[in-house]
Amino acid sequence: MSKAQTLSAADRAKLEALIGHDFAEKERLDRALTHASARTEKGSNYERLEFLGDRVLGLCIAELLFRTFGTAGEGELSVRLNQLVSAETCAAVADELNLHLYIRTGADVKKLTGKRMMNVRADVVESLIAAIYLDGGLEVARRFILRYWQGRAVRADGAKRDAKTELQEWSHAKFGVTPIYRVDERSGPDHDPRFRVTVEVAGIKPESGVERSKRAAEQVAATKMLEREGIWQQSPAGN
């Protein structure tokens, strides 16, 4: 197993307080914060944590939305879910936890900026969720997720509007055409892919979105076009 760097006692106590869980196996937290790029042995262990954390997050958010929005249909719930488990939201949680102070990355990753660095922060949050789940169980992981996602779920008013549906209605009314979506690129490992999707509406400039599923990337691209054309107000940061 790749060896993770060890947090200081002070840093560990501070971070455990933010997480709301004291780790019984301290190395789990260290491993979760040590990105694959900082390990001497590259490979599956860190990616397995991301994989598990992504599934635990998805389950807890799906349950939260199901209970919170009792009259919402599957389409609305899916839009909200995609927004709340997106790389942008996970990275925002990482920032709220000040994980940049604790994440260990390789030299190459330290040079990354923008979207790529956001994805690293999102990956670490997923790994952290897996570590919490493995150390404390599902209820402890759920408590952590509710602590940092429940407010976002309630604030995400824009998610109740399906961007693709609204863009289609607008483009039909204005241009008499249906938006066309195409997948430009698929990257990343099988367990954590990234899709770049472009939406085109005849007569105006196209827009693109990058997300972890084609459906979510389509929503991002449609949202960008709606905001650019003044149909929607630009989403506030953090939502």
UniProtKB/Swiss-Prot annotation:
Belongs to the ribonuclease III family. HAMAP family: RNase_III. This is Ribonuclease 3. It catalyses: Endonucleolytic cleavage to 5'-phosphomonoester. Residues 162-231 form the DRBM domain. It comes from the Bacteria. The lineage of its organism: Bacteria, Pseudomonadati, Pseudomonadota, Alphaproteobacteria, Hyphomicrobiales. It comes from Rhizobium etli (strain ATCC 51251 / DSM 11541 / JCM 21823 / NBRC 15573 / CFN 42). PANTHER family: RIBONUCLEASE 3 (PTHR11207:SF0), RIBONUCLEASE III (PTHR11207). It is found in: Cytoplasm. Digests double-stranded RNA. Involved in the processing of primary rRNA transcript to yield the immediate precursors to the large and small rRNAs (23S and 16S). Processes some mRNAs, and tRNAs when they are encoded in the rRNA operon. Processes pre-crRNA and tracrRNA of type II CRISPR loci if present in the organism. Pfam families: dsrm, Ribonucleas_3_3. Its cofactor is Mg(2+).
